[in-house]
Amino acid sequence: MNRREALISLVQLSALGAIGSASAGVLASDRPLAIGTHADALPQPPKPGALAYLSADEALEVAAIFDRLIPEDELGMSASQAGCVVFLDRQLAGPYGQAASTYRLGPYMQGTPEQGPQFRLTPAQRYREGLARLGQYCQQQHARPFSGLTGEQQDALLRAMEAGTAPLDADFFALLLQNVREGYLADPMYGGNRDMVGWRLIGFPGARYDYRPYLHRKGLPLDLEPVSLLDRAG
C-alpha cells in the first residue's frame, strides 16, 4: 500500500463511522446559502515563530519520525514540509494536549478493547515521556538520537515499535501515526496540510458548502480546487 492508498483508506474509515448517524435534507431554494462564519469565530491559524510546547530538540525528533511515516515523494511533500510538526506543537499546547475533554480521575483498572485506549497521562505528557524514552534507547543502541540514524535504522526501529517488539511503547507509535495523519489531512488553518497537499492527494474538495452546480456531473471527476476554512472566513 502506498502513501496515497493509506491516506485514502484512513479517510474512508473515518467517513464510515459517521454515516450511521448522518441524514440529509433537501433544500428547495436555488439561492446559495449565506456564509455566516466570521474570522473571529474560527480558531486562529498558528503564527510562525517560536514553538508553543515542544522543545527545539523534541521538534527535531518529531520531524524525523514524521518524515519516515510520510516521506517526500513524487506524490507530495513530506510531513514536516507540510507543517505537521507545527500542527502537533499547537495541538499539544492546547486542549487536546491537556486531555481537556477526557475523564482521567479514576478509578484505574484494566479496561476492555471496546473501551478504547485508557491513559492516565495527557497527550502532551505522553509525547514528553515517549520522546525521552526513544532518545535514551537510541543513545544506548546507536550513540546518537533518532534524527541521526540512517533511514534504514529509523524504519527498523519504527517497525519494532509498531509490532511491540522493541522496549518502547507501541501505543506511542500509534499516537505518532494518528497525529501525523491528522496534521497531513486537517484544515490548513491548524498549521498542517500546507497548500492543502493532503487534500489534493486524495481529491478532497475541502470546506465547500454548495455542490448544486455539479449535481449534473454524475460519475465524472469534479477536479475542484480545495477550499480551506480560512478561505470561508469573513
Task: Label the model's feature ranges.
Residues 4-9, 150:
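Short helix-onset patch at the extreme N-terminus, typifying the N->h transition
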Residues 4-5, 13, 155:
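Hydrophobic alpha-helical segments, especially transmembrane helices
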Residues 40, 45-48, 57-64, 68-71, ...:
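Mature-region segments of soluble proteins
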Residues 10-18:
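Sec-dependent signal peptide hydrophobic core
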Residues 1, 5, 18-64:
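C-terminal segment of N-terminal export signals and the immediately downstream linker at the start
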